[in-house]
Amino acid sequence: MGEPGFFVTGDRAGGRSWCLRRVGMSAGWLLLEDGCEVTVGRGFGVTYQLVSKICPLMISRNHCVLKQNPEGQWTIMDNKSLNGVWLNRARLEPLSVYSIHQGDYIQLGVPLENKENAEYEYEVTEEDWETIYPCLSPKNDQVIEKNKELRTKRKFSLDELAGPGAEGPSNLKSKINKVSCESGQSVKSQGKGEVSSTPSENLDPKLTVLEPSKKTTGAPIYLGFPKVTEVHHEQTASNSSASQRGLQMFKVTMSRILRLKIQMQEKHEAVMNVKKQTQKGNSKKIVQMEQELLDLQSQLCAEQAQQQARVEQLEKTFQEEEQHLQDLEIAQGEEDLRQQLAQALQEHWALMEELNRSKKDFEAIIQAKNKELEQTKEEKEKVQAQKEEVLSHMNDVLENELQCIICSEYFIEAVTLNCAHSFCSYCINEWMKRKIECPICRKDIKSKTYSLVLDNCINKMVNNLSSEVKERRIVLIRERKVKRLF
């Protein structure tokens, strides 16, 4: 969760603040600072970065925005997220602002299969600062800053291995070279019969390296790094042990240099004292002491040269370890990317399978509907054919049985004679003006009977015929009515 201590400020401590309390958890709370816009998502430019461990794509890059309106009321807006923002179990419209109040329930994303609740569920609350800040989630910029500090700490040097106040390898190398030069100058001056004074300040700065912190070992090098494979752990452990051995050799050599320095200073003081006491006395003893001083200086130079070589070797080892750690970081990052890509591909294939299943279901439904449509069409065609057949048969019946033999039209006001033959009322009346006999059987006409049933039947059958036939019949009826009047 990170250390929330950086949230505590002088004016805020002891007050009350609004926050989104993570439901069922005492960590991962989101602080709503007055006057600040709070963005939530899985991208890098948001206030709080939420990366789902179960479904990385559940939270969008910039999922939602929380800010205060001019009245100071906190509001929430869905920033066109893929899986949506839910306020009190109701999904919010994208880019629409909604007010939130104490106790409101906020859900980011949707629950996965076989799960009742979503991964990120919050409750709007206002609590005391002392209650809130131990549970707060670190902001995205603070997480990035902390990661930068961790990467900086990994690039340790001799300065860190030697403890606080120690000097780096480059400074140590230059100062050892300086000591070597000063020692060589002292040897040259003594070869001329002069013993120059060597102040203790010339070598004191190098002595700070002799007090490395016991905590500075190879182990802390790997703090803050992600877990890698066992092979990486073994390689790291071997490199760490090599660094520890090199550090121990470095400390031992510096201790020798310190002892030689002290012996050389004591010998130098002894030579000076002897010279003062016996300026022209025992020159043999002075020469002997100067020779011993030269031997000590030569030994010191040799130790310093060895120390220089060890420093270079240690620097090389540290550089190799640093490069190795960087390679491990790159490999781990690539592995994480491969895992994310594999998971994304798996989700993609699952979605494609679901789409294929849906496609097959839709195709089956469409085929069934097409089959039903074809059957309906066939039935309709059959009904139409039957209807046409009935109409054709009806036309035949009308033409053969219900036509007047005089006018060759369908009966209009049908009249049946005593001989059982039927004619139009107008037609038989006109016929009887010339002859009083049946036009068909030539029997005398004794009676005429109007057939209303036959008229109604003919009218209903004509209604099912074409419009031309119906119009022609109407015209004939009108003409005959007019002729009757005259």
Swiss-Prot record:
<feature type="region of interest" description="Disordered">
    <location>
        <begin position="180"/>
        <end position="207"/>
    </location>
</feature>
<dbReference type="GO" id="GO:0030496">
    <property type="term" value="C:midbody"/>
</dbReference>
<dbReference type="GO" id="GO:0000151">
    <property type="term" value="C:ubiquitin ligase complex"/>
</dbReference>
<keyword id="KW-0862">Zinc</keyword>
<dbReference type="GO" id="GO:0070936">
    <property type="term" value="P:protein K48-linked ubiquitination"/>
</dbReference>
<dbReference type="GO" id="GO:0043130">
    <property type="term" value="F:ubiquitin binding"/>
</dbReference>
<keyword id="KW-0963">Cytoplasm</keyword>
<keyword id="KW-0779">Telomere</keyword>
<keyword id="KW-0833">Ubl conjugation pathway</keyword>
<dbReference type="GO" id="GO:0061630">
    <property type="term" value="F:ubiquitin protein ligase activity"/>
</dbReference>
<dbReference type="GO" id="GO:0010212">
    <property type="term" value="P:response to ionizing radiation"/>
</dbReference>
<comment type="similarity">
    <text>Belongs to the RNF8 family.</text>
</comment>
<feature type="region of interest" description="Required for interaction with PIWIL1">
    <location>
        <begin position="68"/>
        <end position="72"/>
    </location>
</feature>
<dbReference type="GO" id="GO:1905168">
    <property type="term" value="P:positive regulation of double-strand break repair via homologous recombination"/>
</dbReference>
<protein>
    <recommendedName>
        <fullName>E3 ubiquitin-protein ligase RNF8</fullName>
        <ecNumber>2.3.2.27</ecNumber>
    </recommendedName>
</protein>
<dbReference type="Pfam" id="PF13920">
    <property type="entry name" value="zf-C3HC4_3"/>
</dbReference>
<keyword id="KW-0227">DNA damage</keyword>
<dbReference type="GO" id="GO:0034244">
    <property type="term" value="P:negative regulation of transcription elongation by RNA polymerase II"/>
</dbReference>
<dbReference type="GO" id="GO:0042393">
    <property type="term" value="F:histone binding"/>
</dbReference>
<keyword id="KW-0597">Phosphoprotein</keyword>
<dbReference type="GO" id="GO:0006302">
    <property type="term" value="P:double-strand break repair"/>
</dbReference>
<feature type="domain" description="FHA">
    <location>
        <begin position="38"/>
        <end position="92"/>
    </location>
</feature>
<dbReference type="GO" id="GO:0070534">
    <property type="term" value="P:protein K63-linked ubiquitination"/>
</dbReference>
<keyword id="KW-0132">Cell division</keyword>
<feature type="zinc finger region" description="RING-type">
    <location>
        <begin position="404"/>
        <end position="442"/>
    </location>
</feature>
<dbReference type="GO" id="GO:0005737">
    <property type="term" value="C:cytoplasm"/>
</dbReference>
<dbReference type="InterPro" id="IPR017335">
    <property type="entry name" value="RNF8"/>
</dbReference>
<dbReference type="GO" id="GO:0051301">
    <property type="term" value="P:cell division"/>
</dbReference>
<dbReference type="GO" id="GO:0003682">
    <property type="term" value="F:chromatin binding"/>
</dbReference>
<dbReference type="GO" id="GO:0045739">
    <property type="term" value="P:positive regulation of DNA repair"/>
</dbReference>
<feature type="modified residue" description="Phosphoserine">
    <location>
        <position position="157"/>
    </location>
</feature>
<dbReference type="GO" id="GO:0008270">
    <property type="term" value="F:zinc ion binding"/>
</dbReference>
<dbReference type="GO" id="GO:0005634">
    <property type="term" value="C:nucleus"/>
</dbReference>
<keyword id="KW-0539">Nucleus</keyword>
<dbReference type="InterPro" id="IPR000253">
    <property type="entry name" value="FHA_dom"/>
</dbReference>
<dbReference type="GO" id="GO:0042803">
    <property type="term" value="F:protein homodimerization activity"/>
</dbReference>
<dbReference type="InterPro" id="IPR013083">
    <property type="entry name" value="Znf_RING/FYVE/PHD"/>
</dbReference>
<dbReference type="GO" id="GO:0006303">
    <property type="term" value="P:double-strand break repair via nonhomologous end joining"/>
</dbReference>
<dbReference type="InterPro" id="IPR017907">
    <property type="entry name" value="Znf_RING_CS"/>
</dbReference>
<keyword id="KW-0156">Chromatin regulator</keyword>
<dbReference type="GO" id="GO:0006974">
    <property type="term" value="P:DNA damage response"/>
</dbReference>
<comment type="subunit">
    <text>Homodimer. Forms a E2-E3 ubiquitin ligase complex composed of the RNF8 homodimer and a E2 heterodimer of UBE2N and UBE2V2. Interacts with class III E2s, including UBE2E1, UBE2E2, and UBE2E3 and with UBE2N. Interacts with RXRA. Interacts (via FHA domain) with phosphorylated HERC2 (via C-terminus). Interacts with PIWIL1; leading to sequester RNF8 in the cytoplasm. Interacts with WRAP53/TCAB1.</text>
</comment>
